[in-house]
Amino acid sequence: MYAREREMYPPVMAWFRRVLKGRFPTAAVETYDTSTVGLNRFLQGQGLHHLFPQYQSYDIFVDVTAVVRLRKSGLLGFVECKRNQISLRDLSQLLGYSRVALPAYSIIVSPAGVTQAVHYLLNTFGRLDVLEYSSGRRLKVATWDPWREEISLPTLIPPGEYR
């Protein structure tokens, strides 16, 4: 499958860009590998910082970042990629990033699915509240299909939130 997490980034970036372009057809949508640079420095270096007034506080290292440029503002989208099963620690990492920057979309994906603890927490015990990072916004968790190069919709948590 993937020998390294980094190998997931190009197909994930292409998929995420397609999804966001479908949702914002008139906006400029780009996806970036931001895994090795702080998001604050990245936005400033790309000249996108003016779209995000709080960008200086974004000292976070998200694997894939999408920028949706609207007329005078912008939206962020995050995807964290995991080669192994998604753990509670992984969820916590993305939850922290999302609470800092408040992206419009925040997704964590892995071709290996989720750990048993995550499955129990979210599916068996229905604790979807732990995914919330802002009012009306919560993380999405999904299995990445490496052959189709997109998420597997039946695995999406919370179910039905593919919007």
Role assignments for model-derived ranges:
Residues 2, 80-87:
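Short, charged/polar micro-motifs that form catalytic or ligand-binding hotspots
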Residues 19-25, 68-72, 126-133:
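Alpha-helix termini
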